[in-house]
Swiss-Prot record:
InterPro entries: Ribosomal_bL17, Ribosomal_bL17_CS, Ribosomal_bL17_sf. SUPFAM superfamilies: Prokaryotic ribosomal protein L17. The gene is rplQ. GO terms for molecular function: structural constituent of ribosome. It comes from Ralstonia nicotianae (strain ATCC BAA-1114 / GMI1000). It comes from the Bacteria. GO terms for biological process: translation. Gene3D superfamilies: Ribosomal protein L17 (3.90.1030.10). This is Large ribosomal subunit protein bL17.
């Protein structure tokens, strides 16, 4: 019986699945909005939310744990300098999954994964203009 096995295999080897989720996590932290299939989005949430919770407390040990999972110094820096303080008062639920129709080629259900409370694009452009 397949009771209490907590992850989807996504038809990949364990190394491929780990690398894919690592790359998707880095993309989500970089762009704060990505489009993927619904099962991948649900698995990505299980990876990203603990990392953001880890980033709420900026210690060397937490940075090393995050780096072990992400393997990207720039994203670890962004995680601890921008995202950790942004979600410091939120007790979880940092991501939002929005269903986004079906992929044309194989009719796979698609989803948008975004970080909640992310700055809107217009606000970011205005902030850059004000900085100049």
């Amino acid at each position: 019986m397949r009771h209490r096995h907590g992850l989807r295999k996504l038809n990949r080897t364990s190394a491929h699945r780990l690398a894919m989720l690592r790359n998707m996590s880095n993309s989500l932290f970089q762009h704060e909005l990505i489009k993927t299939t619904l099962p991948k989005a649900k698995e990505l949430r299980k990876v990203v939310e603990p990392l953001i919770t880890l980033a709420k407390k900026d210690t060397v040990a937490n940075r090393r744990l995050a780096f072990a999972r992400l393997r990207d110094r720039d994203m670890v820096t962004k995680l601890f300098t921008e995202l950790g303080p942004r979600y410091a008062t939120r007790p979880g639920g940092y991501t939002r999954i929005l269903k986004f129709g079906f992929r044309q080629g194989d009719n796979a259900p698609m989803a948008l994964v975004e970080l909640v409370d992310r700055p809107e694009v217009a606000e970011a452009v205005e902030a850059e203009a004000a900085a100049e």
